[in-house]
Amino acid sequence: MAAERSSITLGGKGSSLSSSSVYNVASGVANVRIDSSAIERFSTRNVPSIKRSSFGIPQGLTNEETRASLAVLLNKLILSTSGPPSSSTARSVLPLKIVEILNLKAESLELGEIDVTEGENIVLEKSCASLIGICSIIDHKSTTLSQIVDSVAALSCEVTKADIASFSLLDSGDGNGDKDVIGVAGDLKVLLNGYKGTGKLEIEEISKIPWIHGKFRYVVKSVHADARRELNSGVKGGKTGSGNTGIGEALGTTLLPLLTAIKNLGVCSFLRAKLCFEKIVDENLKKCLSEKICVENENLKNSYKLAYTAHLEEDYCRFAHKLNECLGIVWRIVGLEAVAAFFALAGGELFVQKSGDADKEESKTDKKKKKNEKKAVVGKGTSLVIQFIKDRLVSNDAASDGDQMHSLMQCGEQILNLFNPEGRSFDSLLDKVKEIVESNENRRLPKLPKGTRDFAKEQMAVREKAFSIIQNVFKRHGATALDTPVFELRETLMGKYGEDSKLVYDIADQGGELCSLRYDLTVPFARYVAMNGITSFKRYQIAKVYRRDNPSKGRYREFYQCDFDIAGLFEPMGPDFEIVKILTELLDELEIGDYEVKLNHRKLLDGMLEICGVPPEKFRTICSSIDKLDKQSFEQVKKEMVEEKGLSSEIADRIGNFVKEKGAPLELLSKLRQEGSEFLDNQSSREALDELSIMFEALKRSKCSERIVFDLSLARGLDYYTGVIFEAVCIGAEVGSIGAGGRYDNLIGMFGTKQVPAVGMSLGIERVFNIMEELNEKQKQVIRPTETQVLVSIMVDNKLAEAAELVSQLWGAKINAEYLVSKRKEKHFNRAKESGIPWMVMVGEKELSGSFVTLKKLEKGSEEKEDQTCTRDRFVEELKKLL
């Protein structure tokens, strides 16, 4: 009994036509009907008509393509009635005739002559129905192929046992990777979950799968978008002859990359299939399948040439027809790859055994061979695909014939039919593959968002050590702690960071207010000072901030900042000196290696730019360019200043001469203040040099000036800096700046009525963590994840009460202690060794009966020979002495 055909309704309110619907009508699995509301919109006027010999559908199309053309034409006629009624509005006669033709289950379509009005003739002439119809078929088949082909490629990976480690390297985490290539690699890893071939053999045909398939996915999406638009666009035209001109060129432009992508996909599948053939034991089967796929490969080459020629000749309908032909060939090649992979993975032999040869006696060697072949499929996803194929073949009794070769060929034909988009079981296969990928996606281990990290065990120990040092330094300078909300009103943050404002994270669910995650700790501090009317405040804050950029090495989207700020009126340059001094103390005590603090003055920069002839309105944007000199050459920065920011080449060169200057603070300051210096003639730069003179003298007397480098190329891109600016970098470590800051006298005034001058610094603690971890690894220092001093070891099972009594006494004495109850002695020593615990309180059967404990000291995790015994009432006091 034939399956009941579904029905697709056109012209309903809010309805749209999809490529899948066109394909279903074209392939005869769905009828088409016109919504009653659409029929009412057709014209009922008696208007002159003309005879046409056809619907304007080119000769040489397949029956499927012709039906698709008629389906598109029908929709275009319906769409032409969407405007106000006129003499050009289509009548119902022609659409109903098309519906009648489409719903007939005829092998060939007899279109015949038709009578059309002027308006209907415009639709027939200008709708490009055939091109759009074929494009819809291509869209549907390409989309389904992109969903199936990865599962077939995964089977080939299983056969070849190729190394797929490169699949995990495609997503670099910097946001610059190809989304579709990464997506294919991800789906392959899901299908190959549990795969054991990694690290064995790198095969080019396997390694390039993500790129070939990813680019195919990308182009298919583009075709889908264009097909959807053209399917649901009406035909606009009248007596002037205007219409949807350029549709052919537009679709031809979209389809041409797909032709190349399809050809590459087919060639890649063909090469993988050849690798699979080598693993097939039956020589006759191997030869037969190899001949078939070689024929298809030659057909693909020829069809590709014909399609490309049609495109060059601007015959876009013939081009689409030939492209559709190429697509059909690639479908067959992919199907043959699936057949080859199935037989290579023992699916064919197992099927024959079940169907007809189960009664034959097998040798031990054959049984062992089959057992190993069963183990060949180790990927969870690929195992399910193989099992799905087996179930379909067995249920269809494909190998009932006694002739093994004939049975195998029948089996192969059924697999081909399974991978045929027009086959009855194809939808089941497609659903199964989607189910595998989606269900495995749910079970896939979660991963961290880009630019974030977890801290655990040793990392937390390093972090706590760093935070302790930092807090001690901050408190030493008389600061009080402050904590502010992790998010602020968006208006508070916007306009404070210059070009970096685009990196602020906005919160999706605003809860009635426009809020953003804090970008730094300085702006929230300024908001707090202004909001509370504070005129003098020295504070520190250690908290997380968030930046929506592509993180480089040592940089994150979520990271800690350790800030120290001084707000209020003090001795001139006193706070500036102290802030820089604090930064040097921090870096010295953290012991992260050699470093230098680059220092400059924003007024000196402004004076320099004024001297060079830069317009005042461009000062900030040019400073942002100068700030890139630590990462780019001057030629690159000059190109940006000239081509993007509108400076003349001469002005850029003058800036280049100045920003080369850097050196010891007092020496370079003396040079810049020499008689005849251009800086002395500029008020802004002269003020800066006077302030720097005071500060450099203070730094020299505090014995930290050797760490300071006076650098005119330091610009710091943030808008709110007004005076001294500085940045600390590690010498010899490519991790960028590890601390920075400067004076910002106007920022607090932006939030209140009082102008409160302020200066501050921020330590990039994430980079400090990385450096500390690397140094620990190089020096092979063992970092204890815990501070446990004593392990209470109850070496008898089911004695929790004993452990509770003893360990509670230690906790009561403020001794860091853990307990373990197990009769396995090695378990206790392993625990102590892994955690670096120096002392054990051991209680075994002997200790229980004698009411005493044994104290054992561990040196680097190994047992000391001399143990001490102690009564239960005195062991805590004894441990206090020993610790």
Curated annotation (Swiss-Prot):
GO cellular component: cytosol
Disulfide bonds: none
Catalytic activities: tRNA(His) + L-histidine + ATP = L-histidyl-tRNA(His) + AMP + diphosphate + H(+)
EC number annotated for this UniProt entry: 6.1.1.21
Domain of life: Eukaryota
InterPro entries recorded: aa-tRNA-synth_II, aa-tRNA-synth_II/BPL/LPL, Anticodon-bd, Anticodon-bd_dom_sf, His-tRNA-ligase, HisRS-like_core, HisRS_anticodon
GO biological process: histidyl-tRNA aminoacylation
Coiled coil: none
SUPFAM superfamilies referenced in this protein's UniProt entry, alphabetically: Class II aaRS ABD-related (SSF52954), Class II aaRS and biotin synthetases (SSF55681)
UniProt entry keywords in alphabetical sequence: Aminoacyl-tRNA synthetase, ATP-binding, Cytoplasm, Ligase, Nucleotide-binding, Protein biosynthesis
GO molecular function terms attached to this record: ATP binding; histidine-tRNA ligase activity
Subcellular location(s) per record: Cytoplasm, Cytosol
Span of the signal peptide: none
NCBIfam families linked to this entry: hisS
Family: Belongs to the class-II aminoacyl-tRNA synthetase family.
Name the UniProt record assigns to this protein: Histidine--tRNA ligase, cytoplasmic
Taxonomic classification: Eukaryota, Viridiplantae, Streptophyta, Embryophyta, Tracheophyta
